[in-house]
Amino acid sequence: MVQIEELGKVLAQLFDIRHDSNDGKSESLIDTLYTSLKIDKHQALTMDLETLRIKLDQGDHAGLQRMELIAKTMLEESFHNSIEARALLTKAKDILTYIQKSDQTFSLERVELIDFISNLLND
């Protein structure tokens, strides 16, 4: 769980520079998140959701929490990567929807993120 908390702090830094032109720092933070989660972006984008959950579970049953970090990373990366933005947003939305259905805890934050991403995809 310490890893998830630390990665949450990295994600918060990425959120803080969302509209900043410091792409070097954002790219470094994004790489840190994917590397720490032991997955690369291509795998995360192409893997089916159940396989992604199993890969991220890492034996501690925190796969859903790591999936949520991946989804939020993809959302933030979409602001810095216009070429892959649509694919990143689509997968982030799919992941969050999967988590919302699979998790025992209902999350208003997830619902709002899903709506936010849907609006971004419709613009």
Where are these regions (language model features)?
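"A position-specific structural signal for the A-helix of alpha-solenoid helical repeats
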Residues: E5, V10, L69-E76, E112-L120
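Mid-chain, well-packed structural core segment of small domains
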Residues: H61-A85
